[in-house]
Regions:
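Aromatic-lined carbohydrate-binding/catalytic grooves of carbohydrate-active enzymes
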Residues: 53, 62-65
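Flavin (primarily FAD) cofactor-binding/catalytic cores of flavoenzymes
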Residues: 1-27, 33-51, 55-57, 86-337
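Glycine-rich flavin
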Residues: 67-86, 234-236
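Short, flexible helix/strand-to-coil boundary loops that buttress conserved ligand/catalytic motifs
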Residues: 58-62, 69, 217
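Residues that flank catalytic or metal-binding motifs in active/ligand-binding sites
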Residues: 63, 72, 123
């Protein structure tokens, strides 16, 4: 009750900044894609982004990260990503493109603004950020997942006295030189970080299942085909037994191919426990470890929506075609499936 009183008192003192048709929360690629179509339809909107500049999650990605598809398949609506130096665009090239895209269309963007909660007010949604708020007929949440890294908590990792970090906080391989490192996770981030760290450290790759590699001549374009086929099937009310593009998840970009030539793209089953300076495998054997890099994915960043009663116990929001099923003027984009 005390916390509720304080919240209401703060809100009563908050200053209305603007009334618009739509508030977009987040400033990454999903937010920009949404903004493009709102502007085309002449819908009034504002983007509230908690970053200091354009680029979204890419601002925090590790230095060597690359897109998994060529620039021609990685563009937003209206303006193609310029030709890049390499087949797969680099982190900096993506940031430059997103920044230029935002400037090109002159989207009304305010940053840094951290939205802490939203309240319903009659038919409107009031979007609060500290002592400021924006009133909207609808809200598009595009906060993504990068700020909510997922790390398994059921194996006693608090016992481990070595280095632990998530891929969200990984920058480059330098801190791991000459160390014994375990990379956990069988997706693209795990493969890319393993490829880089294995050049300077003794590495072990841990995955729950055998890594699934795409063929060398197949890239991230296959994911677009899969997503399109899945969406079409959903709209037509049918199920898919085999998705387009064949098997595999890990894109064989140059750094991963190079790691293959060094024989490091082999993994083993997950360890079952931590000790202070080692991990314990299922057979009871131990392995000395200096650092663990968790490439274990992310959860949706939904804290700002909790006061609306739309976040389910499994920490998701039930949607149909991107629209909240509990609140019809709330939309979510860019969170994956």
């Amino acid at each position: 009750e005390y916390g509720f009183t304080i919240t209401k008192r703060r809100d009563a003192l908050a200053q209305l900044q603007a009334e618009v048709d739509v508030v977009i929360i987040g400033g990454g690629q999903s937010a920009l894609a949404t903004a493009y179509f709102l502007k085309r339809k002449k819908v009034s909107f504002v983007i509230l982004d908690d970053q200091s500049q354009a680029g979204g999650a890419w601002l925090h990605a590790w230095q060597s990260l690359r897109l998994f598809s060529p620039h021609t398949w990685s563009s937003l609506s209206g303006w193609m990503m310029p030709t890049t130096e390499h087949t797969y665009p680099t982190r900096n090239e993506v940031i430059e493109y997103l920044s230029a895209y935002e400037q090109r269309y002159q989207f009304p963007t305010i940053r840094p603004v951290h939205v802490d909660h939203i309240e319903q007010e009659d038919d409107y949604l009031d979007v609060y950020a500290g002592d400021q708020y924006w009133r909207a007929k609808a809200v598009v949440s595009a906060t993504g997942t990068w700020s909510k890294p997922h790390i398994p908590n059921d194996i006693g990792r608090e016992k481990f006295k070595g280095i632990q970090l998530h891929s969200a906080d990984y920058v480059n391989a330098a801190p791991f030189k000459n160390k014994k490192v375990i990379v956990v996770g069988g997706g693209n981030s795990g493969a890319q970080i393993l490829a880089e760290v294995s050049k300077v450290a003794e590495t072990t790759w841990v995955t729950t299942t055998a890594p699934a590699f795409l063929s060398d001549d197949v890239d991230g374009r296959v994911w677009f085909l899969r997503a399109t086929e899945r969406l079409k099937a959903q709209q037509e009310g049918r199920s898919l037994e085999q998705l387009a593009g064949g098997l595999g998840d890990i894109v064989m970009i140059d750094s991963v191919k190079e790691a293959r030539t060094r024989g490091v793209l082999h993994s083993r089953e997950p360890f079952v426990a931590f000790a202070e300076h080692s991990v314990v495998w299922a057979d009871g054997s131990t392995q000395a470890v200096d650092a663990v890099i968790w490439c274990t994915g992310f959860n949706p960043a939904l804290n700002h929506l909790r006061g609306l009663g739309v976040v389910e116990p499994d920490q998701t929001v039930a949607v149909h075609n991107g629209r909240s099923m509990k609140l019809n003027n709330l939309w979510l984009v860019g969170y994956g499936e």
